[in-house]
Amino acid sequence: MIPVEALTPFEARIEHAELVETIARWDEAYHAKDAPEVPDDVYDGAKRRLARIEGRFPELAAKSPIRDKVGAAPSEGFGKLVHAVPMLSLDNAFAPEDVAEFDAKVRRFLGLGDEAPLAYVAEPKIDGLSINLRYEGGRFVSAATRGDGAEGEDVTRNLETFPATQLPRTLGPDAPAVIEIRGEVYMTKADFLALNQRQEAAGEKLFANPRNAAAGSLRQLDPKVTASRPLSLFAYAMGEASAPPAASHWEYLERLKAWGFVVNPLIRRCDGVAGLLSAYESLGEARATLAYDIDGIVYKVDDIELQRRLGFVSRSPRWAIAHKFPAEQATTLLEAIDIQVGRTGALTPVARLTPVNVGGVVVSNATLHNEDEIARKDVRIGDTVIVQRAGDVIPQIVGVVPGKPRGAVPFVYPETCPVCGAHAVRPEGEVIRRCTGGLTCEAQAKERLKHFVSRNAFDIEGLGEKNIEFLWEKGWVRGPADIFRLKARNDAELLQRLENFEGWGKRSTEKLFESIKTRSAMGLERFIFALGIRQIGEATAKRLARHYGSFGAWRAAMLAGTEEARAELTSIEDIGPSVAGDLLDFFSEEHNVQAVDDLVAAMAALDGAVEDAKVIESSASPVAGKAVVFTGTLVTMTRPEAKARAEALGAKVVGSVSKKTDYVVVGADAGSKAAEAVKLGIATLSEQEWLALTGAAD
């Protein structure tokens, strides 16, 4: 694999798109299906390489639909519970330098010097399923999985099967009126082996690893199944609390123990980077002897007030990080190389392997990245290959064991699409070959439809991949608008009505049509994401929706064709020339505009519409939706802290002053931005005036 530092812009752009698509697929398998396709450290490695590429090429950051994403949408088999405080994931560290950089970032954000005391808590990172337990008036009332971070699955009845020694039903009189306690449901190694022995004896499917077994056991529609499984629970974090139960995380853990929760006995309190690395080394040495699986150690700033000040960025807290353990390797046989065609036409090679256990997880597929990598490593069908679960690279075949089998020939990369037969071209300087068939390519068209109905797009219940394939083969659905005309078409049929086909039935067909009608009203950000425009992920779609506000305004801006419209587009956070180019190119094609308008019309025919973007209203914040510029040196907070607070109130913090700026907050030694604000007649505020406006003044 080419080192990130050596990637050309073309190579970075193509690998970035490949990483985004791969990670999104893994997220769905891991969080929604409890069937991880790759080991955790392979996944972490892909995320880390993605972050390194985005760090070197910042303009690519907006191309990540998984950038701000946590988990996956809750399963439709369970009710949903909204998390009052989002359940976010953690950034990762893989080397001592990463830990030192984490500590340095915390200190910079808080304005602390290198020698200032800063305490942390180091906790084993349990490999299980995260859970949120809500108590009101000291009594257990509900439990939810992480889900997509904003809302999770209601598994209250399943948690009620846990013994009181694992899950206290009541807390002490000192508990806040409302408190959410977070932890990890896991399965010990011994219990996992015993469960699989019972599964095998009963002729049932075996679980791949303890984490998968724990997740599958907890997410059962029948609580009796959960009760029959040997699950355990460690408590370690806090969600919503009506009053702070402790001043530090360490004190909070002590409070959890007093309330009857099991807290991991290996948790340590540490000072500075040296203390964190010492805890990491000690835990790494003990890892093999533990009764349960861990995949790293989590470091948290101990002081809860400092945690509050540090806040969150994107999908993770600034005050915590996960330090992961190193990679593992195994050898296996490469049985075949398949070429997959994605919705953007990218031809991606996938290695089909004889299943092999790599560090406790069965791996049967691995990416081969692109044709250059296949040629560079001289990977051939029939080779014995080295599969790596890696800490800093994408899941991959890292090498070939010497001694190729007789008759093995070099792999010839196709120059035509394996699905539609159209030319597959590779522009000069790029590493990805793409099908030129566009929407005439069945693979691309079907993949776009699957994307359109997916959980984070239109999320149409009853219209999964299998049913999309069926409707495509029947010729009833060839584009998004056809979905919203499906009932009318079905009603007009005399013989081939949907409910008459095997696997459908009257009730399931009615439910599908009800779901389609419900989804005929859709928020702008999901609508934009669902279109499947290249490089437009969930995060970018959300920024576009919030910026333009309505479908009409967004459509008009995309079709304006003026330099002013392009400049406005690139002024949006994380949208650079490349992303803007793909957006405008999409709308420059008349058939795309027609398809979008046709979709909106079909939605309207069912009394639906594309709904305007919701304006963030944080406690009726007076700055919600306002564009704010900070300039000069601030006194009461650091610049990153000011930005984080403003965004938490719904403001849009921008880096330059323009006619669209609402406020310029002027600190000491302000430069040209303050002068530009005066010139344009934009309101300027002192730091104290800003604090007074936002209700943060003393």
Swiss-Prot record:
The gene is ligA. HAMAP family: DNA_ligase_A. Its EC number is 6.5.1.2. One of its GO terms (cellular component) is cytosol. The active site is at 125 (n6-amp-lysine intermediate). It catalyses: NAD(+) + (deoxyribonucleotide)n-3'-hydroxyl + 5'-phospho-(deoxyribonucleotide)m = (deoxyribonucleotide)n+m + AMP + beta-nicotinamide D-nucleotide. This is DNA ligase. One of its GO terms (molecular function) is metal ion binding. Belongs to the NAD-dependent DNA ligase family. LigA subfamily. Its cofactor is Mg(2+); Mn(2+). Zn(2+) binds at residues 417, 420, 435, 441. Keywords: DNA damage, DNA repair, DNA replication, Ligase, Magnesium, Manganese, Metal-binding, NAD, Zinc. It comes from Paramagnetospirillum magneticum (strain ATCC 700264 / AMB-1). Residues 618-698 form the BRCT domain. One of its GO terms (biological process) is DNA replication. DNA ligase that catalyzes the formation of phosphodiester linkages between 5'-phosphoryl and 3'-hydroxyl groups in double-stranded DNA using NAD as a coenzyme and as the energy source for the reaction. It is essential for DNA replication and repair of damaged DNA. PANTHER family: CHROMOSOME TRANSMISSION FIDELITY FACTOR 18, DNA LIGASE.
